[in-house]
Amino acid sequence: MRVLTLNAGSSSLKAAVFEIQSVPQSGGAPCGQVWTADSRGDAGLVGDLLAPVLPDGIDLEYKTSPPIEVVGHRIVHGGTQLSDAVRITPSILDEIARVSEHAPAHNALALDVIRRTIALFGDDVPHVAVFDTAFHRTLEPAAFTYAGPLDWVADGIRRFGFHGINHEYVSGRAIALRDRPAESSRIVTCHLGSGCSLAAVHDGRSVDTTMGFTPMDGLPMARRSGAVDPGILLHLLRRGSHTIDSLDQVLNEQSGLAGLSGTTGDMRVVLDGMDAGDPRCRLAFDVFAHHVRKGIAAMAASMGGLDILVFTGGVGEHIPRVRSAICASLGFLGVAISPDRNLSAAGESELSDASSAAGVFVIPAEENWMIAQACVRVVSSSVR
């Protein structure tokens, strides 16, 4: 089956084409990729993002010989109604649009991409939505319920969690690399990129995570604040220094590493500033590392311990200094990494040294591969 996957971020679009012969097994390494492309730009200019990814030539090379048989789309927020990969229909599109207010930078772009690709490929090619929130559908009420009025839950206000496509992938790969059964594995996955989240994966199921009702919650990120005392927001509103819209802009675009350091929020720029003696960059780095360490400990507490720690995402995969700073104080969880392994890590790599009770790994994100697998499962089940 030839699958086209489209992974729309807030200002980027990644695409890949896979040839998959059968329904893949969980935890398997990516295979069958025959083409890939990505683009970045203004989130409002979807045509500009699509042009490099879906050039006119795709009609000749990938739509006709052999044809694309299914198109898969990453959707960040599925709300309470969309908790598994599903074939896209008009009613599914309506539901994705309904919950877009909770992830407007992501869902709105994905919807536009879906509509444009349906127009490109026509009605005969099925489209499948794969949700970042789906992996976290196994959270228990104690983990997903906010301690506000109970009717919040009835209104759909709860912890959803995000980055689930990648948390599911890297936890499955970690089990395979560690060569132990999922049923006895307590894994903390650290997705550290421009957006950051942790997940506790016990027995192959997500049992806790740091992002919440929206992707703004949890860890400090490149430009997002992560969790803040809600009293701060009430204080700023009462003082009249901010409106709801201006607070939205501050929390989503002017906070996190960018807000603390005065930079773009790129971790590499923060590290350069720190090395040059900039105290703001030092503070930004220390705040980030502190919250990630604290979050890892909290995730481990949700499972009663830690067997495997995984770093993934752009920062988690490519910046050894971040991994070293995070792991330095996690000895109480049985974490010890080899400095040499940490510095030389490339692709899937084990960082843990011989004294480490917990396995520590770097595992590159492979969201497109997970989307392709979900497409095959959805389409295969619909033709039985």
For each feature predicted by the language model, list its residue ranges.
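Short beta-strand-loop/turn "lid" adjacent to the catalytic site in phosphate-handling enzymes
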Residues: D59-A108, P126-V128, T133-Y146
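Short glycine-rich, Thr/Ser-proximal phosphate-binding strand/loop in the N-terminal lobe
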Residues: V3-G44, G212
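Short glycine-aspartate micro-motif
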Residues: V3-T5, V70-G72, V128, I187-H191
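Glycine-rich phosphate-binding loops at beta-strand->alpha-helix junctions
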Residues: D307-S329
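Glycine-rich phosphate-binding loop of actin/hexokinase-like ATP-binding domains
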Residues: R137-L237
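Structural signal for terminal/edge beta-strands and the immediately following C-terminal loop/tail
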Residues: E348-R384
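Phosphate/ATP-binding catalytic cores across multiple sugar-kinase/actin-like superfamilies
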Residues: V170-R173, L177, D286-G304
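A mobile "lid/hinge" subdomain adjacent to the ATP/sugar-phosphate binding pocket shared
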Residues: R239-D286
